[in-house]
């Protein structure tokens, strides 16, 4: 905690005001005062909640109504002494819990990553003396000595700075080094613009200084993020909610039927209680799709592997299906929608405006006048030659080609863009000698070099146009010098700003003969403007097509950037973002209440000058409108927004570890197109999950109906619990994997996102599973009725029924391949998974029917070959009936409109 908050933020106060408000001095605190404050405010450490132990998280996976049914069945089997059945049923419950536990994402890791960012020791000034203390002992009012390489131990107000530069990417995601000063700042500023504050967890890249501790522990920026991460409750995914509802529905239905049958059988059939309980256990086990949770987890895992091959790492399994329901993607601009390679697109001189071709650091692309596509040739002494020479030599960056043949720059992106520009056209050779340099500094916003160029001695200057305009008295033209025309240059800047270009000016001045030193005073008069360059971070070509795909798929793309609104709108229009004609700023968002924000979140697609806090509120606002939100981020302070989003998307290259831990998905290439590919894969996986659910449940319905009919008729129970578990775990699970490998259907990205509240078991799905379940049950019942009078043993009849149900399932799996179309399409041969699982199923059936130890364990008998033919024909007939049902349903839907 910190001392009482001042009326103005610390960054708006002078050093003396801050020291007074926090009751400290340049000599630091006394030992007694430090001890008192430590007792009052607590240790400088992030608060943490105790995590659940592993065994408790494992037991939580038994908290499911369907698992309750299995555990109750196992307990009854134990009481009745049926050990084999008990172990098999209990084993199924444990396997399901193990799979869920293994796949569970440990959310505590993201909080631990934040805590790991804190340093262990700090050098402080107390009573005028330097002391090294544990960072946990820091208190508000301590003076911390800062050196290059240090990790900042608390939030500090800079009171002394010597070329102090800090790497804040770990907090903000911005890769540029921030220069710090002790000067007071004015107005409300976002976190990244508070140049006199140092934040806990960031790193000093160069220079040094001193800082006054203004916040410790949970009151630091890092502490606020830690608290937000602890408080955020992750939304349960639509599928998780639906499967819970489905489980409860099945549970209640089973309970009602079992009670009704128990009463009916006792009154009208006079069955022994022990026999009745065994029959009802069989019914419970038959009606519960035991394998479904494991099947869903494994299909999602296969989706994770497929996405990893497409450069999207899924960290939390349910994310795979959530991607298919996503309605909005909020994406950062730099590096995700754009190339993160600043590129010059225009050069403006007093005589001519040039267009520059090329969209990357590769030094390829012509330069030509805007009204003439003919490439220019640079001649010695021309204005363009002098301009290109200036931006090349007044430049600290380097253009290099790496081992993979890719062009890269070292240094800042703006200087890098100018270096690439100069390399696009060969300049006439000239002997150049650097004599002196004034490095770029954010305080004066320009850079200057003193060169001898051949026989000429010149000062070269590059920097912000508004700064250089104040220094210039003349401008260079093809005909020599003429008075500086401010109106002309301001018009050009306004014109190209509308295209989203950032402007950099270049100028020169003759130097005195033999001059060896360069000072700021040398540049205060006599400077001649050469021109300005307009540059931008160009859109990724693949992002443009990916956004078009998303819009086609009914997904709105919203761009979030720290850029100026005009620049943001221009980039948005190039990308093809929906409503790119208007933008809203972070400051406007901050002034809105929750209702106004939810309306603005729906209305606007371009969000400029935004902060990570705006991102968090934006996610909440969109979710309040029932949107399923994907959010990208890279800095630590993006982590709460990512954790809150339905799909948090972290950048794999420039993202921090904390952000990656908080995210559901990590892009290994930081590319928006990868998100679009992941959406395609998510929809495919969801389709296959739905097909799998439609495939599994009819078998349970058929098994349950067979037992219900037998109880009502007072007949032999056709299937034992272990045979039912064999069907549900071995047969259903095996065949389900064939559907998991099914390719996406043709219209997968031409349909809108599914509604998150739309149940996987919609009206048509319920009709289908009931229809198929009844058909399988009736077929098996008729076959059983035909076999019983012929004197076959109970074991033989059960084996024939098992074979009938398994064969019917295999054919129905083929039906489920395609939702509406004919299932025996050419894609059937392309899906190798179906043929692999078919082979495995055949081997399993041969084993359970003919292997003596399996016959003993499961109570089966060997079948003559003719019964394989009979069951095959029954299955094929059902396949054709379901295909006919699909045709009729399709026609009915078409007629209905």
List the predicted regions and their residue ranges.
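Generic alpha-helical transmembrane segments
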Residues: 730-731, 776-777, 799-813
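Membrane-water interface at loop-to-transmembrane-helix junctions
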Residues: 755-774, 794-800
């Amino acid at each position: 905690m910190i001392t009482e908050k001042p009326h103005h933020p610390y960054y708006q106060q002078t050093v003396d005001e801050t020291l007074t408000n926090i009751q400290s001095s340049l000599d630091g605190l006394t030992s007694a005062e430090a001890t008192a404050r430590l007792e009052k405010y607590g240790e400088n450490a992030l608060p943490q909640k105790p995590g659940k132990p592993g065994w408790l998280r494992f037991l939580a996976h038994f908290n499911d109504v369907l698992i309750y049914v299995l555990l109750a069945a196992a307990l009854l089997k134990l009481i009745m002494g049926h050990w084999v059945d008990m172990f098999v049923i209990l084993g199924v419950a444990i396997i399901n819990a193990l799979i869920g536990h293994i796949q569970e994402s440990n959310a505590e890791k993201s909080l631990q990553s934040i805590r790991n960012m804190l340093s262990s020791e700090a050098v402080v000034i107390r009573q005028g003396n330097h002391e090294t203390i544990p960072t946990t002992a820091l208190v508000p009012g301590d003076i911390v000595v800062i050196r290059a390489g240090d990790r900042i131990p608390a939030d500090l107000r800079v009171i002394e700075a010597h070329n102090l530069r800090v790497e804040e990417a770990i907090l903000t995601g911005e890769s540029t080094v921030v220069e710090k000063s002790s000067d007071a700042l004015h107005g409300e500023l976002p976190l990244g613009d508070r140049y006199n504050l140092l934040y806990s967890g960031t790193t000093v890249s160069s220079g040094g200084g001193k800082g006054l501790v203004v916040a410790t522990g949970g009151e630091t920026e890092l502490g606020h993020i830690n608290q937000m991460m602890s408080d955020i409750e992750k939304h349960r995914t639509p599928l998780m909610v639906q499967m819970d509802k489905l489980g409860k529905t099945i549970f209640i239905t089973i309970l009602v039927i079992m009670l009704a049958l128990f009463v009916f059988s006792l009154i009208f059939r006079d069955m022994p209680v022990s026999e009745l309980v065994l029959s009802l256990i069989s019914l419970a086990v038959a009606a519960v799709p035991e394998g479904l949770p494991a099947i869903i987890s494994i299909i999602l895992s296969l989706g994770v592997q497929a996405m990893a091959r497409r450069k999207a790492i899924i960290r939390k399994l349910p994310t795979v299906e959530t991607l298919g329901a996503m309605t909005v993607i909020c994406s950062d601009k730099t590096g995700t929608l754009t190339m993160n390679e600043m590129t010059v697109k225009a050069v403006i001189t007093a005589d001519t405006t040039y267009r520059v071709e090329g969209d990357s650091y590769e030094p390829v692309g012509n330069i030509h006048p805007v009204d003439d596509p003919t490439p220019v040739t640079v001649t010695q002494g021309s204005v363009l030659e002098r301009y290109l020479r200036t931006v090349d030599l007044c430049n600290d960056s380097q253009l290099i080609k790496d081992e993979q043949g890719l062009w890269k720059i070292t240094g800042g992106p703006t200087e890098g863009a100018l270096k690439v520009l100069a390399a696009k056209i060969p300049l006439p050779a000239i002997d150049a000698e650097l004599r002196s340099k004034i490095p770029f500094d954010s305080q004066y916003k320009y850079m200057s070099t003193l060169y001898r160029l051949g026989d000429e001695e010149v000062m070269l200057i590059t920097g912000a146009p508004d700064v250089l305009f104040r220094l210039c008295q003349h401008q260079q033209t093809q005909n020599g010098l003429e008075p500086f025309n401010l109106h002309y240059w301001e018009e050009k800047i306004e014109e190209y700003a509308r295209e989203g270009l950032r402007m950099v000016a270049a100028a020169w001045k003759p130097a005195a003969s033999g001059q060896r030193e360069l000072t700021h005073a040398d540049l205060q008069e006599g400077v001649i403007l050469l021109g300005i360059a307009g540059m931008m971070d160009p859109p990724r070509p693949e992002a443009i097509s990916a956004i078009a795909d998303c819009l086609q798929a009914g997904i709105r793309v919203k761009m979030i950037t720290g850029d100026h609104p005009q620049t943001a709108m221009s980039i948005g229009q190039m990308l093809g973002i929906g409503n790119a004609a208007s933008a809203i700023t972070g400051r406007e968002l901050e002034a809105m209440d929750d209702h106004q924000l939810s309306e603005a979140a729906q209305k606007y697609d371009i969000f400029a000058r935004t902060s990570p806090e705006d991102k968090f509120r934006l996610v909440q606002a969109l979710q309040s409108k029932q949107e399923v939100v994907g959010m990208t981020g890279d800095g630590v302070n993006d982590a709460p927004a990512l954790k809150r989003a339905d799909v948090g998307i972290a950048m794999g290259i420039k993202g921090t570890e904390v952000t990656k831990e908080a995210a559901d998905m990590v892009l290994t290439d930081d590319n928006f197109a990868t998100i679009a590919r992941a959406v395609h894969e998510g929809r495919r996986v969801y389709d296959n999950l739905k097909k799998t659910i439609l495939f599994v449940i009819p078998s349970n319905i058929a098994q349950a109906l067979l037992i219900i009919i037998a109880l009502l008729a007072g007949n032999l129970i056709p299937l034992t619990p272990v045979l039912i578990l064999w069907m549900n775990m071995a047969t259903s699970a095996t065949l389900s994997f064939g559907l998991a490998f099914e390719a996406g259907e043709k219209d997968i990205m031409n349909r809108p996102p599914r509604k998150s509240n739309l149940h996987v078991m919609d009206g048509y799905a319920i009709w289908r599973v009931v229809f198929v379940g009844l058909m399988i049950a009736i077929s098996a019942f008729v076959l059983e009725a035909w076999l019983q009078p012929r004197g076959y043993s109970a074991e033989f009849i059960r084996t024939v029924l098992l074979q009938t149900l398994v064969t019917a399932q295999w054919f129905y799996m083929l039906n489920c391949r395609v939702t509406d179309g004919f299932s025996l399409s050419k894609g059937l041969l392309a899906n190798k998974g179906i043929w692999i699982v078919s082979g495995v199923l055949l081997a399993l059936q041969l084993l359970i029917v003919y292997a003596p130890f399996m016959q003993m364990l499961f109570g089966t008998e060997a079948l003559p070959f003719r019964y394989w033919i009979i069951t095959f024909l029954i299955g094929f007939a059902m396949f054709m009936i379901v295909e006919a049902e699909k045709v009729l349903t399709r026609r009915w839907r078409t007629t209905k409109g």
